[in-house]
């Protein structure tokens, strides 16, 4: 009896260990886990109706990528996709840290699933892995290890309409596109150019690559197809990277096959928004061009994204990259669709812009700073359309009569350029990011905008998409001081002395002569001791008095043009918070100058509009020699002391005179 009992005891121990192991990896089988999760009910419905998937779970090792119910709500089902569940399964069990750059699915032909790691986030094709709900491990009754990962999107393979094309590479995709389900899109024109230029092998490359294929719609007008040469075709392929839209950082540039010593073309992804929806775009940037390939960027909408193929991923795009054959006018006209990145800008030009379109058509070289769709969602922007004269002036503020790239602004240290608006300039600032990246901001009419899509090339100029409408103020005087990188010191002094608080008042009209940082630096050179005291807490009283001399509060704002009229022959007297400000104004061809206390100073940026006033940025500080004196912290002590010294001196003089007279 001892032998059977010992055998039974050993068997019980083994079963207990197996149960403990199963408990450690997952108390339920993978099938039970999926069935028991209400958020995976749609996926389980697929599973129980597919015999092959059921057999795989029962008999084999497997990794399952299960989409959530929300993912199915965003998925457009098609006839004959009942086997798509097999594209969510592999024949080996992989935890997340065991996943390589690709795994083979169980769908016919074993098309790959591409794995992307981006910091702590993992993507399968374009679907994000929900890591907190993944890595569930179990064993089936045959002892086969199985792993479940939950993803936020349904995984979609290439769909063949003929039933004979499985797991195509990019060349097979292009060459047999009529046998694939691409909706209404056709790619015959691009395929023809690939064959004519003998570039088929580019699309047969083994490994992992990203291919951009323009649809037939983008090959108009007729001269455009002839511009698709070998180098342009190379500019549609990113080697050694599989880039899905959700898994790829925006605005990060990748070298194309057209990145050589003589020609350098990079590609990046971007996202355009109208304030409601987001639309993916791809941008080619020809950094170094040649006689047949212009420098600058070309923007193309991705009309069908994230099509996985054997050697990477394909994106269908609205037009060819690298080809610059539109004028600025034609570029704007190309965004008649409501989801185009400049659709709203183009519409307001048609509605209220007068002959603005004709103006940019006649210009040979221009740069257009075009506000994005999101910029036009501001209420103040919509109110502008009622005043057509004012609106036209604002449109002119967005045009510069020369071709100006971001590189020229940065490398040539361009600070300001005149616009087509009368006596209005644009002012540039380059912000250096922590990763070495550079962001260019542009100010016009008091509005500071960021260039979000630079260097879009046209045959007669350049277009930069910006995130705000220039000339439409949306900040108070205080907020403008806080956010303007040239006015840091004046803002800091105002904060120290509590002077800035009033500048947020919405129902007051301010005219503020604001010294820029360079003006304070000049003052430091002239009087380093006084400059040092300005930034000490003990002298906030005097600082406040100095700033008060720069601020005019009235029932109106004073533009430089208005001040020029007031002081056409004599100096004008403005009621500042501290006494009066007596100024003379001189106007030159491009600038304004003001005279105060016998000193002429340049107005670096006149007429910076704010919601509650106007700012004139200048190169000088209205400061007198006796404004900063040593004394008590509130300023009263030194004034009393100074008065006592002067009075004592006068008494001594009077006493001496009387003694001499006697």
From Swiss-Prot:
Expressed on different subsets of axon bundles (fascicles) in insect embryos. Glycans are attached at residues 54, 175, 437, 448, 488, 569. A lipid is attached at residue 631 (GPI-anchor amidated glycine). Residues 632-662 form a propeptide. The keyword Flavoprotein does not apply. It is found in: Cell membrane. Pfam families: Fasciclin. Residues 1-24 form the signal peptide. InterPro entries: Adhesion/Biosynth-related, FAS1_dom_sf, FAS1_domain. Residues 27-155, 167-321, 329-470, 474-622 form the FAS1 domain. It is a lipid-anchor; GPI-anchor. Transmembrane segments: none annotated. Its main location: membrane. GO terms for biological process: cell adhesion. Keywords: Cell adhesion, Cell membrane, Glycoprotein, GPI-anchor, Lipoprotein, Membrane, Repeat, Signal. One of its GO terms (cellular component) is extracellular space. Neural cell adhesion molecule. PANTHER family: FI19380P1, PERIOSTIN-RELATED. This is Fasciclin-1. It comes from Schistocerca americana.
